[in-house]
């Protein structure tokens, strides 16, 4: 599954970044900093999906060793399924800066359980939106998503430079 996802551009070029949780951790730090929280990746309670010692292997060796985790993950999947739940790798951040990333069982009717393929979801719970949180859901990986993100960033830079009039970036 991981090799297929990598070939389709749904993982980082080095899938260890995804399976270790570090890609999610960096994104969670960005979100935290937007909330004026002073955290870094070391402050996150991070549960990797695979043993860290695999990170010393080459990418090809790593992908080959992942097969050793199939039965363990299948057992977790079946355990969750018996409880009418699914497994999701979930990042959580609260207003005090407490951050966690781990594999969790979620009810099959939960919004996280409804994701397909490379979709991502973020749920914002605030004082105003506690009973009915704000939900943003959409594609989270792949070449077209990355390209549109870069294009959006370029538009933002262009608008900011236009406001500064006369200043340019080379």
Write out the residue ranges for each language-model feature.
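Substrate-binding/catalytic subdomain of NAD(P)-dependent oxidoreductase enzymes
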Residues: 1-114
């Amino acid at each position: 599954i991981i090799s297929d996802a990598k070939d389709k551009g749904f993982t980082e070029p080095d899938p260890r970044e995804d399976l270790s949780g570090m890609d999610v951790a960096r994104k969670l730090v960005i979100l935290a900093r937007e909330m004026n929280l002073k955290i870094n990746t070391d402050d996150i309670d991070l549960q990797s999906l695979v043993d860290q010692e695999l990170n010393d292997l080459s990418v090809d060796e790593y992908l080959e060793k992942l097969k050793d985790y199939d039965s363990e993950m299948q057992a977790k999947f079946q355990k969750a399924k018996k409880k009418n739940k699914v497994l999701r790798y979930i990042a959580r951040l609260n207003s005090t800066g407490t951050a966690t990333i781990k594999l969790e069982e979620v009810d099959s009717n939960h919004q996280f359980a409804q994701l397909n393929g490379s979709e991502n979801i973020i749920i914002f719970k605030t004082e105003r939106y506690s009973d009915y949180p704000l939900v943003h859901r959409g594609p989270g990986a792949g070449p077209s998503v990355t390209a549109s993100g870069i294009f959006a960033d370029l538009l933002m830079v262009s608008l900011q430079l236009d406001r500064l009039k006369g200043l340019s970036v080379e």
